[in-house]
Amino acid sequence: MEQTYVMVKPDGVQRGLVGEVISRIEKRGLKIVALRMNVIAEATAKEHYGEHAARPFFPSLIEFITSGPSVSMVVAGKDAIKVMRAINGATNPVDAAPGTIRGDFALDVGRNVVHASDSPEAAAREIAIHFKDSEIANYSRVDEVCLYE
């Protein structure tokens, strides 16, 4: 099973959307194998978003991500990265389809509720930033036999 990193950003937590996000993940057949709520440290945020360090929005992004609690998850399942990005919708809420998390709940590209890894390499890097291997559970959902061939 493929794994991906997912974060409910501070705006999603503050708006009470954590349960909605988790529900959509699980209803789609993915499973949450690690979960934590915390205020992400500035150094961790800078490591996570390091590829954007030269961009003009980087300081405000770091300020936002560290402004309050977020929920970090490792999500697993068949094609978890692609499926999770489809659940989230386009990064810019204006372009996000109705029925996606961002299409239904996001208001602004800078406050777009959720983050999910965009590639296997990014997923591995982001998971390692936020979780130790010992914090990731290995279990089977009882409905996996119905979900996958």
From Swiss-Prot:
Classification via InterPro entries: NDK-like_dom, NDK-like_dom_sf, Nucleoside_diP_kinase, Nucleoside_diP_kinase_AS
Keyword Nucleus: no
UniProt cross-references to SUPFAM superfamilies, sorted A to Z: Nucleoside diphosphate kinase, NDK
PROSITE patterns in the cross-refs: NDPK, NDPK_LIKE
Obligatory cofactor(s): Mg(2+)
Tagged with keyword ATP-binding: yes
CDD domains registered for this protein in UniProt: NDPk_I (cd04413)
Domain of life: Archaea
UniProt subcellular location: Cytoplasm
Record: active site: 115
Alphabetically ordered keywords of this record: ATP-binding, Cytoplasm, Kinase, Magnesium, Metal-binding, Nucleotide metabolism, Nucleotide-binding, Phosphoprotein, Transferase
Protein EC: 2.7.4.6
Alphabetical GO biological process terms: CTP biosynthetic process; GTP biosynthetic process; UTP biosynthetic process
One Gene Ontology cellular component: cytoplasm
Reaction catalyzed: a 2'-deoxyribonucleoside 5'-diphosphate + ATP = a 2'-deoxyribonucleoside 5'-triphosphate + ADP; a ribonucleoside 5'-diphosphate + ATP = a ribonucleoside 5'-triphosphate + ADP
Molecular-function annotations in GO: ATP binding; metal ion binding; nucleoside diphosphate kinase activity
UniProt-annotated binding residues for ATP: 9, 57, 85, 91, 102, 112
Similarity annotation: Belongs to the NDK family.
Function of the protein: Major role in the synthesis of nucleoside triphosphates other than ATP. The ATP gamma phosphate is transferred to the NDP beta phosphate via a ping-pong mechanism, using a phosphorylated active-site intermediate.
Name of the protein: Nucleoside diphosphate kinase
Organism: Methanosarcina mazei (strain ATCC BAA-159 / DSM 3647 / Goe1 / Go1 / JCM 11833 / OCM 88)
Encoding gene per record: ndk
